[in-house]
Design a protein with these regions (language model features):
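Membrane-interface alpha-helices at helix entry/exit sites of multi-pass transporters
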Residues: 82-86, 151, 181-186
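Membrane-interface transmembrane helices that cradle and orient dolichyl/undecaprenyl
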Residues: 138-151
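TM-lumen/periplasm interface segments of multi-pass membrane proteins
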Residues: 2-99, 103, 122
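Membrane-interface alpha helices of multi-pass inner-membrane proteins
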Residues: 150-174
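Perimembrane helix-loop-helix junctions
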Residues: 167-189
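Residue-level signature of the transmembrane alpha-helical core
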Residues: 88-89, 112-115, 139-140, 154-161, ...
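Short acidic/glycine- and proline-prone juxtamembrane loop motifs at membrane-interface regions
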Residues: 124-133
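Transmembrane-helix signature of polytopic, membrane-embedded enzymes
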Residues: 99-117
Length: 189
């Protein structure tokens, strides 16, 4: 019965996301990744180098580019506790949406969500953008399956411009029904 009920998996999925929020967003020492992401936005605005250490702001190095500053912008302008909370919830919601779009039977989609829930929780407690990278790749796959290469390539380009992992999406070229449209729309984006 659990694998036939979106309500149960939705409560579990977003419940774990809320636990991650409570464990990290209100404890400044626990949201270092969010501070790195926020730094990308503010350093871009201030035209500062993105790939140098900022030990007074956070305790690691940034690996994200200028494009990412646009993604994090709505969260970066908020107080840390609120921006971090909404960042975690937005990433979780995006992945939930992407998995729900998969062309699988309902019980299989729920199974994927159930199996992925632990990894979601782990990544959410670290405020990782990898949650959305996976959502972008799943979304690209779904759009390829629907014959909408232009939307698939948008997801791939966003993934590629934010984190190099997005390059994996280029493998979907081989599954595209209209390969020329895939190439041209990818170049246009």
């Amino acid at each position: 019965k659990l694998f036939q009920n979106y309500r149960f998996i939705g409560v579990l999925w977003f419940g774990l996301s809320l636990v991650a929020v409570l464990q990290t967003a209100f404890r400044p020492e626990k949201h270092n990744n969010y501070l790195i992401f926020k730094g990308v936005f503010w350093h871009t605005i201030q035209q500062l180098p993105l790939y140098v250490p900022y030990p007074e702001e956070y305790f690691d190095m940034n690996h994200y580019g200028i494009f990412f500053s646009g993604i994090i912008a709505p969260f970066a302008v908020l107080p840390n506790w609120l921006g971090c909370s909404l960042w975690i919830l937005a990433n979780s919601a995006f992945l939930y949406w992407a998995v729900r779009q998969l062309p699988l039977p309902k019980c299989a989609v729920i199974g994927v969500l159930f199996i992925s829930a632990h990894d979601l929780y782990t990544a959410a407690t670290m405020q990782q953008f990898n949650i959305s990278i996976i959502a972008l790749l799943l979304g690209a796959f779904v759009f390829i399956e629907k014959g909408k290469s232009h939307w698939a390539t948008l997801f791939i380009v966003i993934g590629l411009l934010t984190k190099l992992y997005g390059i994996v999406g280029l493998a979907f070229f081989f599954f595209a029904k209209d390969k020329w449209r895939f190439v041209w729309s990818g170049l246009l984006w």
